[in-house]
A protein has these predicted regions:
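RNA-interacting cores
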Residues: 1-288
Length: 288
């Protein structure tokens, strides 16, 4: 069962920008895991380990308010410190019950007086959201069976049946052979979703009708994230994909289930470092 959890955090002192990178947030997550299961934390630290989780960059509460529809714009890099006392949030998604079960002790025994460390700053976890919120669209939880059963399987009267509007909220890139590509083609996006769905859901889709998916609206641009160790180029923005032609209802259902799954799994590379955060926007209608 995938969970999209939002941790609300309060730093006690400024967090310098060099400690707000995906690498440092990844380390903080492993520290959280190790606090309840050191063996699991060590295993996840192994670069070859199955990493059934994704992480967001650290957000200030204003991140959901400054532009973008439905909280679609997120802050993915920081040039200035986050001041002490600034309410922040951090999205952690867990893609299987094993990992969620291990971390249940952490959620249930949450000590608001225990500090966690991000660089020189102490952070307190003040609350955790795990269900949909009107002002926090990144929190949710559904079983894989629910995602599949609730996915539309027909064109019908609802516009969303044949139109999938995905927002890419942090820089997104895909592996193509030995290199990265930033173009969100139907193959790159839906094969990324399909691979993770088949890995974790227990409801295998042997083949989806990728040839019936067509981009109909594209509003994207590239961003470059560079630090002392690496450079990452990815796209941000919005793409609407339409399901066109003669398509079996079960294939429509599978494509819609994958699109809804994007909230939890993200797409493309470095999703455990804050990249590739994507989400389906509802109620946007068809774009011509």
């Amino acid at each position: 069962m995938p969970h999209s959890l939002v941790l609300n955090l309060l730093p006690q002192s400024p967090i310098p920008p060099q400690y707000l990178t995906g690498r440092h947030l990844h380390a903080l997550f492993l520290t959280l895991v190790s606090s309840v299961d050191k063996e699991l934390g060590d295993r996840l630290h192994d670069s070859t380990a199955d990493k059934a989780f994704t992480l967001s960059p650290l957000q200030t509460n204003s991140s959901l308010l400054k532009g973008g529809r439905e909280g679609s714009k997120l802050q993915y890099s920081h040039q200035q410190p986050i001041p002490g006392g600034t309410p922040c949030w951090w999205r952690i998604s867990l893609l299987d019950d094993t990992l969620f079960g291990k971390l249940t002790q952490l959620w249930l025994n949450l000590n608001p007086n225990r500090p966690w460390h991000l660089g020189p700053a102490d952070l307190y976890i003040t609350s955790i959201q795990g269900t949909p919120q009107s002002i926090q669209p990144w929190a949710n939880a559904k079983t894989y069976a629910q995602l599949y059963e609730e996915a539309s399987d027909a064109y019908g009267g609802k516009l969303r049946n044949s139109s999938i509007n995905l927002i890419f909220s942090t820089p997104t890139a895909f592996r193509q052979g030995q290199y990265d590509t930033t173009l969100p083609t139907r193959e790159s996006v839906f094969n990324s979703l399909l691979s993770r769905w088949n890995k974790y859901s227990g409801i295998e889709f042997t083949q989806i009708a990728i040839e019936s998916i067509f981009p109909s609206f594209v509003n994207i641009h590239t961003e470059i994230l560079a630090d002392s160790r690496s450079k990452f180029i990815g796209i941000l923005g919005e793409v609407t994909y339409k399901i066109l032609g003669t398509v079996e209802p079960i294939q429509i259902k599978q494509i819609n289930a994958l699109a809804d799954f994007a909230l939890y799994t993200g797409v493309g590379r470095k999703t455990t470092m804050g990249m590739g955060m994507a989400r389906r926007l509802q109620g946007t209608g068809d774009r011509e």
